[in-house]
């Protein structure tokens, strides 16, 4: 079964902060921890899945590799380092950590103040020809996104005015709510955590601080990419709000079908039609490769479906390593539209085979097997 996206496992956006990741992980860990679900295999699997996702995303280097290459970037078999164990997280550790936050402990772990929010990450599907994917290329794309409003410089306020302090939270961005015996701190519902209110909004962005725009970008595609590979353009996602950083743009590669070649990782496959005569007598023919035509020697008595390997004529992987091979599968074509002379020759040839089955070992074996089958009935 294919692994789920780690961000999806934790239920967070790709631009999630470390605090958001930890909060999401603790929530899942408390729910599915084996100490709370003894003997529940499904809960144990979900706990392992959450643990593996958090192990990768909480590590800056592993997260960067995952964002760039997906699961392959952190696969131990490909040089990555993600594991899938329990990671040593006990239920008491997780449980205590949550209550520390709930009662206001942890030295200010209640989240960012001031309302600054990171912009959303964007996804763009880039269609490439096989030749472009194999050799690499540079393409220009246009991406609809949100950019900072130039009229108000992203503040959302009309030029010449400034936001005023929120009267609900007094500019703190947080309010305290009484829930039974506990006093819980929450984001201010009026200013949404900014601590400011815009009394006279900007006419260009209507107080949002961002406007829609088509952004033109140049994307350098490395040689060897394949369908599903992602190219991360840092800071090219949506602009942040209230001074927050921009998100990232993920360019997802989609390689179009090729009229001749099929790709499987670093190897290429193609079918090569050959004549009945060439299959029987042998010969030499030209076959296409991504580097041009090459000669392929066909030995006599070649059967349809035989594979010929052209070493090094495949694809050099984007993450390094030697190029793959081109696998040519020969397909023997039955001649059609025969003239009178050709039919006479084939009739004569067929008669010559009827008295000698050594020329058709597979057919001879099949008929012998069929005869034994009916004899045994």
Curated annotation (Swiss-Prot):
Cofactor: Zn(2+)
Residues at which Zn(2+) 1 binds: 149, 152, 202, 205
Subcellular location: Cytoplasm
Annotated coiled-coil segments of the chain: none
GO MF assignments: ATP binding; heat shock protein binding; unfolded protein binding; zinc ion binding
Alphabetical list of Gene3D superfamilies matching this protein: DnaJ domain (1.10.287.110), Heat shock protein DnaJ, cysteine-rich domain (2.10.230.10), Urease metallochaperone UreE, N-terminal domain (2.60.260.20)
Zn-finger (CR-type) residues: 136-214
GO biological process, one term: DNA replication
CXXCXGXG motif repeats: 149-156, 166-173, 188-195, 202-209
Record PROSITE patterns: DNAJ_1, DNAJ_2, ZF_CR
Domain J: start-end pairs: 5-70
SUPFAM superfamilies reported in the protein's UniProt record: Chaperone J-domain, DnaJ/Hsp40 cysteine-rich domain, HSP40/DnaJ peptide-binding domain
Subunit structure: Homodimer.
PANTHER family attached to this UniProt entry: CHAPERONE PROTEIN DNAJ, DNAJ HOMOLOG 1, MITOCHONDRIAL-RELATED
Protein name listed in UniProt: Chaperone protein DnaJ
Gene: dnaJ
């Amino acid at each position: 079964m294919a692994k789920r996206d780690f961000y999806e496992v934790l239920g967070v956006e790709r631009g999630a902060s470390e605090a958001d990741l930890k909060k999401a992980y603790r929530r899942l860990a408390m729910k599915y921890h084996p100490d709370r679900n003894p003997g529940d295999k499904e809960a144990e699997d979900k706990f392992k899945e959450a643990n593996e996702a958090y192990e990768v995303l909480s590590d800056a280097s592993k997260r960067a590799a995952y964002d760039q290459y997906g699961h392959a970037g952190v696969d131990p078999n490909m040089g990555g380092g993600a594991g899938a164990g329990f990671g040593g997280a006990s239920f008491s550790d997780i449980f205590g950590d949550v209550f520390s936050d709930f009662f206001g402990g942890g030295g200010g772990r209640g989240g960012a103040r001031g309302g600054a929010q990171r912009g959303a990450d964007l996804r763009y599907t880039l269609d490439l020809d096989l030749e472009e994917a194999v050799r690499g290329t540079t393409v220009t794309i246009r991406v609809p996104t949100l950019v900072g409003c130039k009229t108000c410089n992203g503040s959302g306020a009309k030029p010449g005015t400034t936001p005023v302090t929120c009267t609900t939270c007094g500019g703190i961005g947080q309010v305290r709510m009484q829930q039974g015996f506990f006093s819980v701190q929450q984001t201010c519902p009026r200013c949404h955590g900014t601590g400011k209110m815009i009394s006279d909004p900007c006419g260009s962005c209507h107080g949002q601080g961002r406007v829609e725009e088509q952004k033109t970008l140049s994307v350098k595609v490395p040689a060897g990419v394949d369908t599903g590979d992602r190219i991360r353009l840092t800071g090219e996602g949506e602009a942040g709000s209230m001074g927050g950083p921009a998100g990232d743009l993920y360019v997802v590669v989609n390689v179009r079908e090729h009229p001749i070649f099929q790709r499987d990782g670093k190897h290429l496959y193609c079918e090569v039609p050959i004549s009945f005569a060439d299959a029987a007598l042998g010969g030499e023919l030209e076959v296409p490769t991504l580097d041009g035509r090459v000669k392929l020697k066909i030995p006599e008595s070649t059967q349809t479906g035989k594979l010929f390997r052209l070493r090094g004529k495949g694809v050099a992987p984007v993450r390094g390593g030697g190029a793959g091979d081109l696998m040519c599968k020969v397909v023997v074509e039955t001649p059609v539209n025969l003239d009178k002379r050709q039919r006479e020759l084939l009739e004569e040839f067929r008669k010559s085979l009827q008295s000698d089955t050594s020329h058709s070992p597979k057919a001879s074996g099949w008929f012998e097997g069929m005869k034994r089958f009916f004899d045994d009935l």
